[in-house]
C-alpha cells in the first residue's frame, strides 16, 4: 500500500546551499521532517548547479519520510544571468536595465520547457520574453 501524503512544501533554495536556518528549517520542522537529512540530499543533488536558485517541491508522508523534486531555476534568475544583471528594473515601463538576444531567450526557453505550460518552444519563448519585458530587459532581434 502506498504511503499517505500529509503535505507538500514548496521552497526556492540556492543550489548546494540548503541549511537548517530559515526559511528551510521552520518550513520542514512544521511537518516533522528530518531537516539535516533533507539538507544533505538536496545539497548532494544540486551541487553541480551552484549559484542558481532551485525550486523544490517536498512531499511529506505520515511516517515523516519525504521525497522531493527539483525544478528548473526561475526564468527571472536565468534572464538576469544571461543579461549580466544583479536585479531587474523597478520601473520596467520607463527604465530599461539590460538586453538579451533572441538566441539567449531560445536557450532559456529550451531549459525551462519541461516546467512551463507551453505546447511548443515558440510558446515557451513568448513566456520568457514576457518575463523579460516585466523586468525591464529589452529583447534584441
Curated annotation (Swiss-Prot):
CDD domains: Ribosomal_L11. Forms part of the ribosomal stalk which helps the ribosome interact with GTP-bound translation factors. This is Large ribosomal subunit protein uL11. It comes from the Bacteria. One of its GO terms (molecular function) is structural constituent of ribosome. Belongs to the universal ribosomal protein uL11 family. The keyword Isomerase does not apply. The gene is rplK. One of its GO terms (biological process) is translation. Part of the ribosomal stalk of the 50S ribosomal subunit. Interacts with L10 and the large rRNA to form the base of the stalk. L10 forms an elongated spine to which L12 dimers bind in a sequential fashion forming a multimeric L10(L12)X complex.
Amino acid at each position: 500500500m502506498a504511503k499517505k501524503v500529509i503535505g507538500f512544501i514548496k521552497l526556492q533554495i540556492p543550489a548546494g546551499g540548503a541549511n537548517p536556518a530559515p526559511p528551510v528549517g521552520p518550513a520542514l520542522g512544521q511537518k516533522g521532517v528530518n531537516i539535516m537529512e533533507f539538507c544533505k540530499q538536496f545539497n548532494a543533488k544540486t551541487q553541480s548547479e551552484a549559484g542558481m536558485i532551485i525550486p523544490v517541491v517536498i512531499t511529506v508522508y505520515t511516517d515523516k519520510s519525504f521525497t522531493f523534486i527539483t525544478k528548473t531555476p526561475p526564468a527571472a534568475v536565468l534572464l538576469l544571468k544571461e543579461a549580466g544583471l544583479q536585479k531587474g528594473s523597478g520601473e520596467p515601463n520607463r527604465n530599461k536595465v539590460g538586453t538579451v538576444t533572441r538566441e539567449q531567450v531560445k536557450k532559456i526557453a529550451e531549459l525551462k520547457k519541461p516546467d512551463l505550460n507551453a505546447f511548443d518552444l515558440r510558446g515557451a519563448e513568448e513566456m520568457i520574453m514576457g518575463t523579460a519585458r516585466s523586468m525591464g530587459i529589452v529583447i534584441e532581434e
